[in-house]
Regions:
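N-terminal small-domain helix-loop-helix segment of the aminotransferase-like
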Residues: 1-56, 63, 237-240, 341
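Conserved glycine-rich beta-strand-loop-beta hairpin in the small C-terminal domain of fold type I
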Residues: 235, 252-260, 270-282, 314
């Protein structure tokens, strides 16, 4: 948001921002995050004990793996998945359990189909909605079921909430809206997508007090604090009326219609996503996602990663980004049409 840039520019002149800021996060930033949860999601948080500032969602996820996962611990997440979940699992020697997400279920995993033995040995369940790469959104009932399972079997839920705000507003569900969710879960938030601050590196981890306290202790020794002027800018964004987020969501909705609608008119099977910043579509009959993505690049000069970049579950699919402006997206659809693949 432009007003965040203005705040950051003025904050450069604050001599306090040239010093180490509080490692937990500046109080104004943490209070703003708590205000955002209250105003947007109706969730009450104690900013002192339930919020911790991190340098983006990946920083928060990496810290959670470091404090929670030992070699051999079981970590589960849906397939397709954001690649960092797999990489962090491998780096920590975790047992990786992939939960198949299927198109007919709206690209959500069927939690009832998971064998009880998996739940009994599980240490961490990672959820990510709105989802990367599919754009899927999870209803409140899905989160309620996940929380019930976590309470019954004693595992922790980590919800990667990086894409919140960029979809249909009444479907943007925070896991923490579920009663008792903070007993068994943490949510990782990011300012990167909803405020177009990807390069600024600011976010937060919130929820379970014990986990947040452990993450703070880890970060004191192995991490650093978020730059002061970035926290100042982030606090203003979080405390704003969120009209900038609504405008960005409308812009992405328009771009989504250009790409998804264009692909459908060409006969492609496109997932009807209402969130995120990507379009997830199936390669034509007889093509793998990898082969079709290669052909798109070679013939149409349109770049989009094949679904196999996000796990075996995406092997027949391709992801296209909506980050470019409308004219370039229309040109991409035109090129795909002209390629006649």
């Amino acid at each position: 948001a432009e007003f965040s840039r203005d705040v950051a520019k003025s904050s450069v002149d604050d001599p306090l921002n040239a010093r180490y800021t509080p490692f937990d996060g500046k109080p104004a930033f943490l209070q703003a995050a708590a205000n955002w949860y209250r105003n947007v999601h109706g969730v009450e948080l104690d900013w002192r004990s339930q919020l911790f500032a991190v340098e983006g969602a990946v920083d928060g996820l990496a810290g959670l793996f470091a404090i929670l996962i030992d070699r051999g611990d079981a970590v589960a997440f849906a397939d397709p998945y954001y690649p960092s979940y797999h990489c962090m699992s491998v780096m920590h020697g975790a047992e990786e359990i992939l939960l198949p997400a299927r198109a007919e279920l709206g690209w959500l995993p069927d939690l009832d189909a998971v064998d009880e033995s998996v739940w009994r040995r599980l240490r961490m369940l990672i959820l990510n909605y709105p989802n990367n790469p599919t754009g899927a959104q999870a209803p409140a009932s899905f989160f309620e079921h996940a929380v019930e399972l976590a309470k019954r079997y004693g595992f922790l839920i980590v919800h990667d909430f990086a894409y919140t705000g960029l979809g249909v507003s009444d479907q943007q569900v925070s896991l923490l809206t579920v009663p008792g969710a903070s007993d068994v879960s943490v949510e990782v938030g990011s300012l990167s997508k909803m405020y177009a601050m990807a390069g600024w590196r600011a976010g937060f981890v919130t929820g379970n007090r014990d986990v947040v306290a452990r993450l703070k202790q880890y970060h004191y020794q192995m991490g650093s604090m978020v730059t002061g002027m970035i926290q100042d800018a982030g606090a203003v964004a979080l405390n704003s009326d969120q009209s900038c987020v609504d405008e960005l969501a409308r812009r992405y909705a328009g771009r989504r219609e250009i790409v998804a609608g264009g692909l459908r008119s060409l006969g492609f099977d496109v997932f009807d996503s209402a969130g995120g910043i990507y379009v997830w579509f199936k390669a034509p009959e007889g093509w793998s996602g990898q082969r079709f993505a290669d052909a798109l690049l070679d013939v149409a000069q349109v770049a989009g990663p094949p679904g196999t970049c996000f796990g075996h579950g995406g092997k027949d699919w391709v992801r296209l980004s909506l980050l470019k402006d409308e004219s370039l997206l229309r040109e991409a659809v035109r090129r795909i049409s002209a390629a006649e693949l």
